[in-house]
């Protein structure tokens, strides 16, 4: 009877406890960054019972213990503490040691993602970027992740490889692209292979 993100569900299966994190709620766009609590105005507007939200636990910190049943299914030891969970982009930034204001993680998979850390509570009125509570956020040291997603960038890169010649390696494509003057003589490619994204605002 609770709303869960995938990481919350996995932790629930391991521990038997239904919990979430502030970062998780922010991924679901139901976090009030100014008040530091679930976004009641949004929940009320859509008629969502706040009781559907699980209690929060810290992103880093004790979140429960592996149950005997989960231990039997996974091979983990019963009582093993579960001490961390986060979503894909906060995890990616964490894995790249992007933890402090001004630091940025940029990756290109299916989509192209730029994720920067800020100590400011701001938002984009045109909704071109998402804001997340970052993995190391605390009331004393604000750490928000600002995420720009260009949907389909990786797919567009693969398409360019097919067009430019399948024998080229991606690093060779990058070297060729580096020789092109800024502006590409007016050539534009909108890398939205999966459909338009919000950056078009």
Q: Language model features by range: what are they?
A:
Residues 50:
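Electropositive nucleic-acid engagement tracts
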Residues 32-34, 59-63:
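Short beta-strand to alpha-helix junction loop
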Residues 1-19, 24, 29-47, 68-201:
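Active-site core segments that coordinate phosphate-bearing ligands/cofactors
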């Amino acid at each position: 009877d609770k709303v869960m993100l995938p990481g919350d569900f996995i932790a629930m299966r391991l521990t038997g406890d239904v919990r979430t994190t502030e970062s998780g709620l922010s991924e679901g766009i139901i976090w009030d960054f100014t008040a530091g609590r679930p976004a009641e105005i949004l929940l009320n507007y859509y008629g969502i019972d706040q009781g559907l939200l699980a209690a929060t636990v810290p992103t880093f910190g004790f979140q429960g213990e592996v149950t005997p049943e989960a231990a039997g299914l996974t091979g983990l030891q019963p009582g093993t503490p579960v001490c961390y969970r986060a979503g894909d982009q906060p995890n990616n930034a964490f894995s790249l040691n992007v933890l402090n204001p001004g630091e940025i993680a940029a990756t290109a998979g299916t989509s192209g993602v730029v994720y920067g850390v800020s100590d400011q509570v701001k938002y984009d009125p045109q909704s071109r970027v998402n804001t997340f509570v970052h993995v190391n956020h605390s009331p004393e040291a604000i750490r928000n992740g600002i995420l720009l997603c260009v949907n389909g960038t990786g797919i567009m890169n693969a398409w360019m490889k097919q067009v430019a010649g399948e024998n080229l390696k991606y690093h060779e494509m990058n070297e060729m692209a580096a020789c092109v003057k800024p502006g590409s003589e007016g050539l534009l490619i909108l890398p939205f292979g999966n459909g338009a994204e919000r950056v078009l605002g």
